[in-house]
C-alpha cells in the first residue's frame, strides 16, 4: 500500500492522456508546490480520481470518490498572475483508493492506495478485438469529422476511446476500471457502436462501412 496526494475532479484521467489544469484553490496550490519541492526522490505524481455523481468537489471521504483513479505525472508547471498556476500532467498507472489518510496533515486529500496491474485477459482475443476497435474508431471519426490519433499498442487503445468519442464520466470510469485489457477493448467497442447509433439516429453522420464482426 502506498500514499498519494489526490486531486478529485469531475472527469476521468486515462493512462497516457494529457490533462491541463489551472490551479488556484489554496490547497491544490500547496499540492503543486509540494510536488515541485523535490525533497524526496519520488517522481512528482499525484492521483486524479473522479467525484461520484451527487457529491461536490469539497466533499471529503471515500464515499464521494470513485474507487479507481489514475496516477498523474506532472510534466509542466508555470506560474500565472496571482497565486494561480497552469500545470500539465500525463496519466500513468491506475490505482485503487483504499482509504483516506487522515494522519497525513496536508490541506489537500492524501490517500492510501494500491497500484493496479494491467492483466491481459484472453490473450488470443486481444489482437482481434483491438483491430475491431481500431476500425470502429476510424469509421466513427471519418463519419463525424472527429480526430482519431490512435495508439499502436493494443493495450493502450481502449484508453484512447474518449479522445475520439464523447463519453460521460460514468462511461469513462467504466473503461478505466475494467479488470483487464480484453474486457476494456470489448467495452470500448460497445461504447463506440452505441455512440455511432446515437449519431445515426440524429442524422449527424454518414455510414462509413465496417466489415461484419462478432465479439463472441
Segment roles from a protein language model:
Residues 1-216:
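N-terminal low-complexity, acidic/polar interaction/targeting segments
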Amino acid at each position: 500500500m502506498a500514499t498519494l496526494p489526490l486531486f478529485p475532479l469531475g472527469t476521468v484521467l486515462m493512462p497516457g492522456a494529457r490533462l491541463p489544469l489551472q490551479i488556484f484553490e489554496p490547497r491544490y496550490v500547496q499540492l503543486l508546490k509540494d510536488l515541485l519541492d523535490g525533497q524526496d526522490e519520488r517522481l512528482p505524481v499525484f492521483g486524479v480520481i473522479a467525484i461520484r455523481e451527487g457529491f461536490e468537489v469539497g466533499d471529503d471521504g471515500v464515499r464521494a470518490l470513485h474507487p479507481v483513479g489514475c496516477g498523474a505525472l506532472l510534466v509542466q508547471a508555470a506560474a500565472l498572475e496571482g497565486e494561480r498556476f497552469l500545470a500539465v500532467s500525463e496519466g500513468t498507472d491506475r490505482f485503487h483508493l483504499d482509504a483516506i489518510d487522515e494522519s497525513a496533515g496536508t490541506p489537500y486529500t492524501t490517500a492510501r492506495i494500491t497500484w493496479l496491474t494491467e492483466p491481459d485477459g484472453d490473450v488470443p482475443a486481444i489482437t482481434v478485438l483491438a483491430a475491431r476497435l481500431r476500425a470502429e474508431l476510424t469509421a466513427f471519426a471519418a463519419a463525424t469529422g472527429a480526430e482519431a490519433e490512435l495508439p499502436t499498442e493494443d493495450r493502450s487503445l481502449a484508453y484512447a476511446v474518449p479522445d475520439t468519442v464523447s463519453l460521460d464520466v460514468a462511461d469513462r470510469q467504466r473503461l478505466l476500471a475494467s479488470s483487464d485489457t480484453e474486457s476494456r477493448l470489448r467495452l470500448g467497442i460497445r461504447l463506440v457502436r452505441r455512440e455511432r447509433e446515437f449519431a445515426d439516429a440524429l442524422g449527424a453522420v454518414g455510414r462509413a462501412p465496417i466489415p461484419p464482426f462478432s465479439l463472441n
